[in-house]
Curated annotation (Swiss-Prot):
This is Protein TusC. Belongs to the DsrF/TusC family. The keyword Methyltransferase does not apply. SUPFAM superfamilies: DsrEFH-like. It is found in: Cytoplasm. NCBIfam families: PRK00211.1, sulf_tusC_dsrF. The keyword tRNA processing applies. Disulfide bonds: none annotated.
């Protein structure tokens, strides 16, 4: 089976990309355990708890990221540079446990995957 990487690079509530990516991730996890999740650029905002999507008439799907453990999705990475650029601390309590990696290390890790799906 091919190794699949899901890359979240967009803000959570401006488009449906994040929600659709999460749905695809959970569905794919039923078919393979060779997958990982990467949060880069504005995608790091997907990890923040306490969002108020109802203020912009959006659905609150962020809590669904907590299901990753239940689905045995354990490989979660977050770009440390993206966190810094957005004024976020790697010690922030995220909705899922994601390991911070510098950009070079993150690219090397991402290169280990056969398929990369970006949301």
């Amino acid at each position: 089976m091919k190794r699949i990487a899901f890359v979240f690079s967009t803000v959570p509530h401006g488009t449906a990309a994040g929600r659709e990516g999460l749905d695809a991730l959970l569905a794919t996890s039923a078919l393979t355990d060779e997958l990982a999740v990467f949060f880069i650029a504005d995608g790091v905002f997907q990890l923040l708890p306490g969002q108020k999507p109802d203020a912009v008439l959006a659905r609150d799907y962020i809590a669904t990221f907590k299901l990753l453990d239940l689905y045995d999705i354990e490989q979660c990475w977050v770009c440390a540079a993206s966190l810094r650029e957005r004024g976020l601390d790697p010690q922030t309590p995220f909705v899922v446990e994601a390991t911070p990696l510098e950009a070079d290390a993150l690219r090397r890790e991402l290169a280990n995957y056969d398929v990369i799906l970006r949301f």
